[in-house]
Regions:
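Rossmann-fold NAD(P)-binding glycine/threonine-rich loop
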Residues: 152-194, 198-215
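Glycine-rich phosphate-binding loop and adjoining beta1-alpha1-beta2 segment
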Residues: 83-116
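Hydrophobic alpha-helical signal peptides and transmembrane signal-/tail-anchor segments
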Residues: 30-43
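Long, compositionally biased stretches enriched for glycine and/or charged residues
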Residues: 241-519
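Rossmann-fold dinucleotide-binding core
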Residues: 72, 198, 202-267
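Short, solvent-exposed beta-strand-terminating loops
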Residues: 137-157
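N-terminal Rossmann-like dinucleotide-binding module
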Residues: 60-86, 90-93
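A structured beta-alpha segment of the ubiquitous adenosine-cofactor-binding alpha/beta core
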Residues: 111-136, 144, 163-169, 179-194
Length: 519
């Protein structure tokens, strides 16, 4: 902008005077070269401190939740993009309870770099404040309470006949309650130790966590990510004989609650072609953690948009709940969290192999596969100002006019050195508008409750959540979850003490046993 203003000013003043003087015409070319060189120097001077440091020294990455089973995918993505994202060092951070996994994953991560042509050191720490100073990018992929907390999030609602799921319904709200205070404390550390860094969040529920960073953390350099759009864009094109390069995707909505349209290389909409392909048994990129029951075709053709996989919990609620309850009641299967525990065990046994220096195929069994690759592309696009088209959670700014301009939405965006620039989607139809407005207001209540610890605000969120049948059972589920997660909900300490005095106990045997063991 400054360069443009300088050029316009010179066009109005200096150049006319030069050209009016015939004796100085020969100096015009020389002057122009001097001007261009000056503008180049001005651009260098205008580079922010963090840009100059990154370009000179390479990039420092800090990953909080570094002991995650997804970390090898993160390393793979960074190695693949090293030419455009020259990393000088990586720090993997975790907590004491995750120390063993951190050490296993850390050794594997270093093996992956050692097997590459690049000399990158992977540092491990249980103290994020040791890692954060000078960071250029901070990625977050942690789970407060580990998988045992997820199991309680699932089993307690199921014990009352309601959905128990990681990011939807009661479980999703309680995951946010545990996570938001932690992400805000991370932001406070970043303000002190790496104030110029970007925060790239893929800790679930990504939408509420990212929005809380912006709203309550007052931190604008944040982008939230999800693997669901990535999976759709990887698998849908081939169902109509196209490649992703030939198609343009437009997403709009919220994290785990968005829709998209698709256009071909000629600008013609092909959304209905993909919808028709959905009913021919073709792979549509549905995440591994979602039961694949088909949507009603008539509904999709009417909306002329493709819902994300998580919409099955809303559009086919009856069938999805029945499937979840069937697994919950089968001791040989268990909830998704219990299944993931087994998958995680298998993955970490693989990661221990001193000869393994690449991401194993078994990682695809985890529902969050491709999260990390999306994060690497986002970071590379910010660093190199690539203006890549990526679906992210960012500030709305009018992209979805049915929602407040300052709320967080998950939309198609161009990602560059200034962050995410959301692409306008336009108004939604009445049915989708009603859904998304209800979900957004539920999210806002959850975020407020996470920060304030207000019981009434949380109850409001429970009552308006479409996955919860409002009434006595809903309140009981909420109370049991508060007791189950006492260790991670200090903001609700007074409420939890009251519930314990009233004799509230946990109905589900597994969840109760985990709680009694302090897990």
């Amino acid at each position: 902008m400054v360069e443009k203003q300088i050029t316009q000013s010179l066009n109005r003043t200096v150049f006319p005077k030069i050209l009016r003087n015939k004796e100085q015409k020969e100096n015009t070319v020389v002057f122009a070269y001097i001007l261009l060189f000056s503008l180049f120097l001005l651009r260098i001077m205008m580079l922010s401190k963090e840009e100059r440091n990154m370009n000179k020294e390479g990039v420092k990455i800090v990953t909080i939740g570094g002991g995650s089973s997804y970390t090898p995918e993160l390393m793979e993505g960074f190695i693949k993009r090293y030419d455009e994202l020259p990393i000088r060092e990586i720090w993997l951070c975790d907590i004491e309870d995750g120390k063993e996994k951190l050490e296993i994953v850390g050794k594997m991560a270093q093996r992956m770099w050692d097997a590459s042509p690049y000399d990158v050191k992977v540092h491990l720490t249980l103290d994020r404040r040791e890692a954060l100073p000078g960071a250029d990018f901070v990625t977050t992929q942690f789970r407060v309470g580990l998988l045992n907390a997820r199991i309680k999030d699932e089993r307690i609602p199921f014990s009352y006949g309601m959905l128990g799921q990681e990011t939807n319904g009661a479980g999703g709200m309680f995951k946010a309650l545990r996570t938001i205070p932690v992400i805000l404390s991370i932001v406070e550390d970043m303000k002190e130790l790496c104030p110029d860094a970007w925060l790239i969040n893929f800790t679930n529920p990504s939408g509420m966590v990212t929005e809380s960073v912006m709203k309550y953390g007052k931190w604008d350099k944040v982008i939230g990510l999800c693997n669901v759009p990535v999976g759709a864009m990887m698998d849908e094109p081939k169902t109509i004989g196209k490649t992703l390069d030939q198609l343009t995707y437009k997403f709009a909505g919220l994290n785990h609650f968005h829709w998209h349209k698709v256009y071909d290389e000629h600008g013609h909409e092909v959304t209905k072609d993909i919808i028709n392909a959905m009913y021919e048994g073709k792979d549509m990129g549905i995440p591994a953690n979602i039961h694949d029951i088909p949507f009603f075709k008539e509904q999709l053709l009417r909306m002329n948009m493709i819902p994300c996989g998580y919409h099955r919990y809303y559009y086919r609620e009856e069938e999805m709940l029945a499937h979840g309850l069937k697994e919950y009641n089968d001791p040989n299967v268990g909830t998704r969290g219990q299944q993931v525990q087994q998958t995680e065990h298998e993955l970490f046994e693989l990661y221990k192999d001193p000869n393994l220096d690449h991401k194993p195929e078994q990682l695809a069994k985890r529902g969050g596969a491709h999260y990390s690759d999306a994060a690497c592309e986002t970071i590379a696009s910010i660093y190199a100002n690539k203006l890549s088209h990526i679906v992210v959670t960012t500030k709305n700014n009018g992209a979805v006019p049915d929602l407040p301009v300052d709320c967080a939405v998950e939309v198609s965006s161009y990602i560059g050195s200034t962050g995410a620039r959301p692409i306008a989607f336009g108004p939604l139809e009445p049915a989708e508008r009603g859904w998304v407005q209800c979900m957004k207001n539920m999210e806002l209540c959850v975020e407020e409750a996470a920060v304030t610890g207000d019981y009434g605000t949380l109850l409001q969120a429970f009552i308006i959540n479409p996955q919860i049948v409002a009434g006595t059972k809903a309140k009981r589920i909420m109370d049991e979850l508060l007791i189950a997660h006492k260790k991670y909900l200090p903001q609700f300490a007074d409420t939890i003490a009251r519930l314990e005095e009233e004799g509230v106990t946990i109905k589900d045997d597994v969840a109760r046993e985990l709680t009694e063991k302090g897990l």
